Amino acid sequence: MPRSGRLVLVVGPSGAGKDTVLREARRRLGHAPDIVFPRRVITRPPDPAEDHEPVSDDEFQRRAFALSWSAHGLSYGIPASIVGDLDAGRIVVVNVSRAIVADARRRFPCFVVAVTAAPAILAARLAVRRRETAAEIGARLARAAAPVEADAVVANETTPEAAGAAFLGILLRCRDLPCLP
């Protein structure tokens, strides 16, 4: 059965501010029953900068996911409940790894938004987090240069408000896109 909704995949390098952009767009959007922002499930402790559901490895293995992947020793999942949202015609907005975009495009009607920032900005943001060594940050920055096929780009280099407004504009235009088989 064709899905009438659309899965908006938000991708970008670590430090680009994907969660910040999503949070700001969601705040600006207010109540919109046709646009949903499901929480990612991650095998990582809670983090105030990232809206996710923290779970153990065992709990992660018991869950059902529409999309899942592993990166940096962690497991990430998008709840299977998004399939019902897509079937109901909703726009479902999720922060995912660039590595799963091709698989997601094969399985769901997708629109990919890349959130970007200059390398110096990425480096500064990653350093402030204090989750990684300088070598690990360098490796992340090297991966950040890898291209991703995106339908739209949000440059998050000024304020969260500006990037959130740009992203919200993209989301609102997604309402007008034709349904995909």
From Swiss-Prot:
InterPro entries the UniProt entry points to: GK/Ca_channel_bsu (IPR008145), P-loop_NTPase (IPR027417), PhnN (IPR012699)
E.C. number(s) listed in UniProt: 2.7.4.23
Residues involved in ATP binding: G12, P13, S14, G15, A16, G17, K18, D19
Pathway in which this enzyme or protein is active: Metabolic intermediate biosynthesis; 5-phospho-alpha-D-ribose 1-diphosphate biosynthesis; 5-phospho-alpha-D-ribose 1-diphosphate from D-ribose 5-phosphate (route II): step 3/3
SUPFAM superfamilies to which the protein is assigned, alphabetical: P-loop containing nucleoside triphosphate hydrolases (SSF52540)
Disulfide-linked positions: none
Catalytic activity reported: alpha-D-ribose 1,5-bisphosphate + ATP = 5-phospho-alpha-D-ribose 1-diphosphate + ADP
First-level EC class: transferase
Ligase listed as a keyword: no
UniProt-listed GO biological process terms: 5-phosphoribose 1-diphosphate biosynthetic process; organic phosphonate metabolic process
Keywords of the record: ATP-binding, Nucleotide-binding, Transferase
Molecular function via GO: ATP binding; ribose 1,5-bisphosphate phosphokinase activity
Family: Belongs to the ribose 1,5-bisphosphokinase family.
HAMAP family given in the database record: PhnN
Function: Catalyzes the phosphorylation of ribose 1,5-bisphosphate to 5-phospho-D-ribosyl alpha-1-diphosphate (PRPP).
Protein name: Ribose 1,5-bisphosphate phosphokinase PhnN
Name of the encoding gene: phnN
